[in-house]
Amino acid sequence: MFKCPERVSVKKKEDILDLPNLIEIQIKSYKQFLQIGKLAEERDNVGLEEVFREIFPIKSYNEATILEYLSYNLGVPKYSPEECIRRGITYSVTLKVRFRLTDETGIKEEEVYMGTIPIMTDKGTFIINGAERVIVSQVHRSPGINFEQEKHSKGNILFSFRIIPYRGSWLEAIFDINDLIYIHIDRKKRRRKILAMTFIRALGYSSDADIIEEFFQIEERSLKSEKDFTLLVGKILADNVLDESSSLVYGKAGEKLSTAMLKRMLDADISTLKIAVEADENHPIIKMLAKDPTDSYEAALKDFYRRLRPGEPATLANARSTIMRLFFDSKRYNLGRVGRYKLNRKLGFPMDEETLSQVTLRKEDVIGALKYLIRLKMGDERASIDDIDHLANRRVRSVGELIQNQCRSGLARMEKIVRERMNLFDFSSDTLIPGKIISAKGLASVLKDFFGRSQLSQFMDQTNPVAELTHKRRLSALGPGGLNRERAGFEVRDVHASHYGRICPIETPEGPNIGLITSLSSFAKINEFGFIETPYRIVRDGVVTDEIEYMTADVEEECVIAQASAALDEYNMFVDPVCWARCRGEAFEADTSTVTHMDVSPKQLVSIVTGLIPFLEHDDANRALMGSNMQRQAVPLLKTEAPIVGTGLEARAAKDSGAIVVAEEDGVVDYVDGYKVVIAPKHNPTLKRTYDLKKFLRSNSGTCINQRPLCSVGDVIVKGDVIADGPATDQGELALGKNILVAFMPWYGYNFEDAIIISEKLIKQDAYTSIYIEEFELTARDTKLGKEEITRDIPNVSEEVLANLGEDGIIRIGAEVKPGDILVGKITPKSETELAPEERLLRAIFGEKAADVKDASLTVPPGTEGVVMDVKVFSRKDRLSKSDDELVEEAVHLKDLQKGYKNQVSVLKTEYREKLGALLLNEKAPASIIHRRTADILVQEGTVFDQETIELLEQESLVDLLMPPCEMYDVLKGLLSDYETSLQRLEVNYKTEVEHIREGDADLDHGVIRQVKVYVASKRKLQVGDKMAGRHGNKGVVSKIVPEADMPYLANGETVQMILNPLGVPSRMNLGQVLETHLGYAAKTAGIHVKTPVFEGFPESRIWDMMIEQGLPADGKSYLYDGKTGERFDNTVVIGYIYMLKLSHLIADKIHARSIGPYSLVTQQPLGGKAQMGGQRFGEMEVWALEAYGVAHMLQEILTVKSDDVSGRTRIYESIVKGENLLKSGTPESFNVLIKEMQGLGLDVRPMVVDA
């Protein structure tokens, strides 16, 4: 049986924890959003369910009509993902929602069609209009509370806080220079500045005494004689002191006690006073009490409203409803579970489920935040400001949440329409049902817009499996609600200590997006709040346990974490008394007794792609970044080869990318060919499972996707085994390039500036040959002038040009094509305006002859040549124009189809009955099963299941059965659910087939009669100008392909395959490539594959030992001989095997020349760029170069007749034709443009002819 090859390693023991599923971030999130496979009553209040529950019920303005949401139901996809790509349609399911409408006429329930929802494929992608797309996860500022500080121009530090909700108005509070706190709402600083005390009163704390009680500890002090004065003078009163009989006020809450006040109180026989402990006249709260213009709840509300909405009448009702709407109405203000979690964590509130479900602001939150702010001001050591770049304050919005927000805005739009329709409905003429007032357009258009146009919905990078995998694990700080790349500063982009194990510090693009687009680290997961977690081993009493704890960045702050490479003995205790550890973002040597956790693996720091770089620890980070990014650009080769020196992640990356086919259960291979593998499962060999292989499909990047079986008939397969290789994989391992024998030496100057010299042998062996597939599409439409026709009968085209076209005008498969060849012949009716005047005259005289047509065939564009490998034709069938024979044939076809469908249904029912029997027969019912609608007891508790009872259950649907949760019934529910889904899928497939037979391809765009897609495959060999790279950021361009005989050779006559420049190593500091070369040489000689995981790879000494064991020079250097002269080079040269990739920047796609082509209308100069068939611009610097040589006539020619002198161009053409040799240049058009521009500025510039 085939197994992935074992790799030799120096690692002492394997990782304690396996990598999680690498595309879990996508799949888990979307699964949670749709909750497919769950019954309506079992669905949690998350995702789509949560949105419906939030928006509904909708009430009419007079509350006489109520529309309630009951449940939603998802259909099954009409086509498979591959078929959707082929047809250019969206892979989606129908969404039907059950509503209940209550009005004066009674209660009505109805299921309403709400459009379609795209669903995710098994690989974590979406297919939108035939293109595979990925929704990138977004990193944004977490809702919750943040405390900050800024320096005032006078040098004072001003503290502030911000309460950021998930949806709604921001609330900010900031100290001013006088130690007063002001509240700002929605960041509109100047206009909406409100004293914090006024805001507190507006929340309902009306009296000064209430406010003081909230902020200070209150103590009762006795006042018996003047001796007590010394303890009381200067203290702050916590309550008003008044004489109850005469209502005379001796002191107000918040006032500072003076000797005179105390005397008056003593005289009035007041014996006890309430004092605010720790308060003094400089305390911000006391200062604000004195400053506050309001003294009651009502006055504060009005003042708040006046400042918020200046110019509007401040009535109490308006003011109250405004503050309620701003912060206390869950439809307008929502902290979200995350915001509440962050707020409670920071302010020390309880974290129970009930508290976390409160999504609006509470009075306690504002008071708690102000208390914390004052503690910061007072210099309390336990209070700290927040770092907004810390991952505790940044969270990830995955695909499910992003789409949920879109659905929310779509349904909110729909809510307004529904309410309007309810109010405008005429009950006298018609009865109201849900379907009449619900418009599905709102939801459908929002989803279409998001998947098609959002910055986070991206065309999947499918160059190779790694590119695909990385794209799904990408994190972006851009997009709606995120940052703007122009305004993002250095701090946001920088690597932060909290990124350890969560976000890869290496993998990010070079250029304007650096640091804003990042990648998830290899072991990282995203928790329910959207924070990134990373796993650690727990250390108890100095023993490193195998228990794993996933921690968010804020929890980790309190821990002391040892490195995964710290030495342990056989009892899992630290060998040394001290080890390197991290705590609060600092690395230091810690006493092992203080360590609380330990890293799971050294590679948890980096992402998957970075983890594929061997000897990463010896590379400079900048080059490692390039190495990571360039692996994603490697083109899948025709002949794949796994790296000799790997890191051990190759197999896992290939498996999770979805490029290879993996067995889903144990079994035996029953049948194998190039298109499918059939496996008979171990538990039931009759239920054979077929794995269809992808053959020669075009990827998003134009590369070829082809899967090859790896197993043979009779092989025993275990679940998880690789049964077929895909693009850029070899024996189930990632294989992006080739192991090449290289020499680091200069060679006749050809490898100057990182250029690469390769041997012709590599070309002969097809080592770097790749296949590209281009798709060309042509549609025939029904136009105003008549139907377009796809035909072989094209006007004015010779027979030899049509040689490769079939009878129907479509090119035959296998034809070799080059630029300009016709792929599909098409003629379209000519309009009257396109006729020449003499033609029109002849028509007027001789009458209308058959309407003329013009050639609109699809031809091969310049720069493309290859072999036609596939043709797909989609066409509509006109039911009225079918002949009798066609109708008879159709009827026979439909009959066969129906027969097949019935057979499949009966097989499915038999299978289901067998499974039910195996589960239930002769078992006791653990609880009663009740019919949901009729309330009949179908199975009594304790009944022994017999055949009759099982048949009774078999006829019921899952929705109608009420079963208490228990192990047996949970399995039963799963069986029922699978059976119903399979039945539904069979039915949809049958209906789709019937529709196809009757109407053809009905999902073509409106007005399209026929659509043809032609796929041309071209073989690209390695050529001069192609870009190549290693895995260490060592990139270069092929400068020369040298005959094998001329290449340097070793003493044994073996020629080197590639020559690299040694000067590319020292300044770039990527020594990993040199170590890889040595280890590759030793491993190749020994005939083994090795793995050297990041940070725990082969030490230098072990590589030298291996070299000596294999009889190779200890320093890895050998003498080479010049292939041209046979002489030995003076010095020894580093030679060995290095893994080199061919990148998708091929010279064939970039090189371009123009003879004739389009001109710009304004300047009359040729356009620029390959896509526009543009020319090369002879710019000012090039002019200077020619001026330096004084070539006046050549310059005049270049700047006039060869460029934009319109009349001169024509004259020179004529003179060339006639064979004359004269150059008369006129005025360049660009000079006329300059004159016109100056005239536009009001300057009258005219060229004047001056007589010599």
UniProtKB/Swiss-Prot annotation:
Entry GO terms, CC: DNA-directed RNA polymerase complex
Disulfide bonds listed in the record: none
Alphabetic keyword roster: DNA-directed RNA polymerase, Nucleotidyltransferase, Transcription, Transferase
GO biological processes: DNA-templated transcription
Reaction(s) this enzyme catalyzes, per UniProt: RNA(n) + a ribonucleoside 5'-triphosphate = RNA(n+1) + diphosphate
GO MF term (any one): DNA-directed RNA polymerase activity
Xref: SUPFAM superfamilies: beta and beta-prime subunits of DNA dependent RNA-polymerase
Pfam family, one: RNA_pol_Rpb2_6
EC numbers, comma separated: 2.7.7.6
InterPro entries xrefs: DNA-dir_RNA_pol_bsu_external_1, DNA-dir_RNA_pol_su2, DNA-dir_RNAP_su2_dom, DNA-dir_RNAP_su2_hyb_sf, RNA_pol_bsu_bac, RNA_pol_bsu_CS, RNA_pol_bsu_protrusion, RNA_pol_Rpb2_2
Domain of life: Bacteria
Enzyme class: transferase
Assembly description: The RNAP catalytic core consists of 2 alpha, 1 beta, 1 beta' and 1 omega subunit. When a sigma factor is associated with the core the holoenzyme is formed, which can initiate transcription.
Recorded family membership: Belongs to the RNA polymerase beta chain family.
Function noted in UniProt: DNA-dependent RNA polymerase catalyzes the transcription of DNA into RNA using the four ribonucleoside triphosphates as substrates.
Name of the protein described by the UniProt record: DNA-directed RNA polymerase subunit beta
Record organism: Chlamydia caviae (strain ATCC VR-813 / DSM 19441 / 03DC25 / GPIC) (Chlamydophila caviae)
Name of the encoding gene: rpoB
